[in-house]
Amino acid sequence: AEEAFRDRIGDISSPEELIADFEVYSFVMRAFDLEDQIFGKGLIRKMLESDPVEPSSLLNRLTDSRFREMHLALGFTTEAGPQTPDLTDPDFLNDVTTRFYNRQYINENDAQNETVGTVLEFRDKFSGIDNWFEVLASEKLTNFFQVALSLPEQMSALDLDKQKALLADKFDLEKLADP
């Protein structure tokens, strides 16, 4: 899969072309942990074509941060409009392949032991966590903090602002910046 990705991604110049090459498309989707969305090709194409600065664009209406990460990494559309990104850049290729293997490792471990998967997920995401709403957007991260901070699972039924307040009372997220 990696060989096909590296060999053919450079020939792709649009979201439509990416989706047409199922092997490359699948590799990219798995790299961004969007395997469960692989068959939503229309949604993915529209998301990749979305204007990242237009508040009502599809990209900005999607709440799952994985879509934004993929959109930014591929760069088919920027604030300047549609682009033809350089998908042969070695840094881009290495970033996507590293993401792919990290994600496969996390998912395989999660399938065998959910606790290990949760810890690996936390390790993968913790440096990018800026606020409690980012934690609450991820079921795994929410679960991790509930267990780590001895908070009841039932708190997930509360209003998001109340959940945020409970978490903030127990732990200062700024402590994650200095492990």
What are these regions (language model features)?
Residues 1-23, 27-179:
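General marker for long, soluble alpha-helical cores
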